[in-house]
Swiss-Prot record:
SUPFAM superfamilies: Ribosomal protein L36. GO terms for cellular component: cytoplasm; ribonucleoprotein complex; ribosome. Keywords: Ribonucleoprotein, Ribosomal protein. GO terms for molecular function: structural constituent of ribosome. Belongs to the bacterial ribosomal protein bL36 family. GO terms for biological process: translation. It comes from the Bacteria. PANTHER family: 50S RIBOSOMAL PROTEIN L36, CHLOROPLASTIC, LARGE RIBOSOMAL SUBUNIT PROTEIN BL36C. This is Large ribosomal subunit protein bL36. It comes from Gemmatimonas aurantiaca (strain DSM 14586 / JCM 11422 / NBRC 100505 / T-27). Pfam families: Ribosomal_L36. InterPro entries: Ribosomal_bL36, Ribosomal_bL36_sp.
């Protein structure tokens, strides 16, 4: 999980999800792409 100020989808499989006001990126194909805004 990368914590970044600016989160962007890295590949076409990345999904943007908002949970409790926190923007996250989840990726089934490549879990290395997981990110959270912080």
């Amino acid at each position: 999980m990368k914590v970044r100020s600016s989160v962007k989808p890295i590949c076409e499989h990345c999904k943007v999800v908002k949970r409790q006001g926190v923007t996250r990126i989840i990726c089934k194909r490549n879990p290395k792409h997981k990110q959270r805004q912080g």
